[in-house]
């Protein structure tokens, strides 16, 4: 009697658990026959958990999770290139009739048919991962193997577009959940042509993990949309003539303040000062230049515990000063503009503009400091600021 689909799936699960010596069902499994230049059969599967020591000596350690058979005779599992480094968690067997039983392992490593097998294994593996149900993918696969996908985007140029579709991020749309780049693009506002990384009512993707910023730097665009890191200068959400004219008018109105900040208040600590187009609630922000390190990247580089020395590139990026952006809609900024027009040497304004090193006592947050300055300068309540932020967002939506 013909087996049911469920019975076949149960047999595959039993095989995978026996093969990997694990008690949990695999996250995904695929059984296929490849034909063409070389014919072979294969069963591949994704384990439930990251194999122990997966990232020990990453890239230099051979993977023994793929076992090669020739006409049902075991040949070897001593491979370095059966699967790319980022897919070294995939387990399974390959049985080919197109290889010789007498071939040595050394010769096999250079065999041209092995390269064909590898290419097809990668294609089938990515196809298998893409078909994992969203809930299982987000809750199980991404938590265990998300780092592998990000490393793949960095290292595997030929499959980068496919791997980008498998990336997941936290975003401002639903902070408790994770989202794909495809979902982010679908939710884009009209006229938005860039994916925001880090807001004026725009969904922002959070780069919270060390590897993920390298990953995005290796990915020029997704679905025709380039990435825009809002922790860097030059963020624009709308390039329409109406928006340009509006911003130019604001820049002209506030011109004395950025000039005063750059030339007098904190001239030795910043590269330049400018009027922001994206701040809505914060009164100001320090952002990196287009080719500089973001604050997150700086923390990553400073945390390199085994760094043996700094190269020319590292020293160059580490020494670059930040750009100081001000929010022209914030009551405190408006009051600063009024005060410096009256007296450029106003002690209160000078004190407010000083950029200090990070506090040794983190209990006093930036928000606490801002509230203290509000009281000192007798500027806007929280309700007034919120109303200003709402008006700012409404203005952008209209544009």
UniProtKB/Swiss-Prot annotation:
SUPFAM superfamilies referenced in this protein's UniProt entry, alphabetically: HSP90 C-terminal domain, Ribosomal protein S5 domain 2-like
Keyword match Chaperone: yes
Region (Disordered): 350-399
UniProt feature coiled coil, ranges: none
A GO CC annotation given for this chain: mitochondrial inner membrane
Cross-link (Glycyl lysine isopeptide (Lys-Gly) (interchain with G-Cter in SUMO2)): 130
UniProt biased composition (Acidic residues): 354-367
GO BP term, example: protein folding
GO molecular function: ATP binding; ATP hydrolysis activity; ATP-dependent protein folding chaperone; protein kinase binding; unfolded protein binding
Keywords, in A-Z order: Chaperone, Isopeptide bond, Stress response, Ubl conjugation
Composition-biased stretches (Basic and acidic residues): 368-399
Similarity comment: Belongs to the heat shock protein 90 family.
Function: Putative molecular chaperone.
Protein name: Putative endoplasmin-like protein
